[in-house]
Amino acid sequence: MELEILLPFPSAETMTESWAFSEAQIDFRHDPEAGARCTISYAAVELRTHLLQMEPDAQICFVSQRHNGKAAIELHADSLTASGDAYALLPQKDGLLIRGAGRVGVLYGVYEFLKMQGWRWLEPGTAGEYAPEPGCGLLWPKNAVHDASASTLGRGF
């Protein structure tokens, strides 16, 4: 299986893993764009890590531009400065668009997609992680999935 994870940032091919773990260098309140890049990159790394556990022989790469004909999961935030946690999983011709209202929505959308694959997290760390059997293939949603917090304050504190 070949899959592209499309991020909305130039240089995603080489910088995604670095951005994903740069939270200690970012002031999320004063530099929300850098915060969004960090969170969305972390979501991409989580997605690739978990999908590779399901499909160890897969070739999954990060890209900033989609290549025609390749399956792709596109990560998109409606706003890089908003803190919205709503998300949508939108089936596309050759993949999936995970669209969040903000950076947190993208992360929640990635975890929802992984839950569809059979992943469960019963407690923090790998000890509380339930993984689907390797080689079972990807399950693509047939219909759009939408979710938004019922609270205007978000899902938690």
Predicted segments — roles?
Residues 1-91, 136-146:
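Acidic, contiguous N-terminal accessory segments
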Residues 34, 40-46, 50, 82-84, ...:
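Feature activates predominantly on carbohydrate-active enzymes
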